[in-house]
Curated annotation (Swiss-Prot):
Family of the protein in this entry: Belongs to the SufE family.
Pfam families: SufE (PF02657)
InterPro entries for this protein: Fe-S_metab-assoc_dom
Record-given protein name: Uncharacterized SufE-like protein RHE_CH01250
Length: 148
């Protein structure tokens, strides 16, 4: 991955602010779709079984990159999905976790943030389970890397 490449278009703080600003869920869903459209497309060669997230109804791929201290590396992520809303959820997950040390990622439960903005409560059970699978995969990977 080239240095300085942006992995997502909006920061988590910006996403939270936008969610608070938007009044109804129809507008919020459109916003999630827009976040997905802004997400760089994952290269075809990275859409491998190893990068596929299990537990998602849609196809979702996550690729992890690390840099810095091998004992507590900074982790960044690329991701993609074949479904519009899920692609937006991938963008939110990447905004939440990318660019942080592995130990911080392992300790950060994104579902507290997602609940605060009402995201989890307004997703179908399939999408909510997929979101949980993405978060679980990232946090488990971070725990392994932080313990290395």
């Amino acid at each position: 991955m080239p240095k300085g490449e942006r992995l997502f278009m909006a920061s988590l703080d910006q996403i939270i602010d936008d969610f608070v600003f938007l009044d109804d869920w129809e507008d919020r869903y459109r916003y999630v779709i827009e976040l997905g459209k802004a997400l760089p497309e994952l290269a075809e060669e990275k859409r491998t079984p190893e990068n596929k997230v299990m537990g998602c109804a849609s196809q979702v791929w996550l690729v992890t990159h690390t840099s810095g201290d091998p004992e507590n590396p900074i982790m960044s992520f690329e991701g993609d999905s074949d479904a519009h809303i899920v692609r937006g959820l991938v963008a939110i997950v990447l905004a939440t976790y990318s660019g942080k040390p592995a130990s911080e990622i392992a300790a950060l439960d994104a579902f507290e943030i997602f609940s605060k903005i009402g995201l989890v409560e307004n997703l179908s059970s399939q999408r909510s389970n997929g979101l949980r699978s993405m978060v679980k995969r990232i946090r488990e990977e971070a725990k392994v890397r932080a313990a290395a």
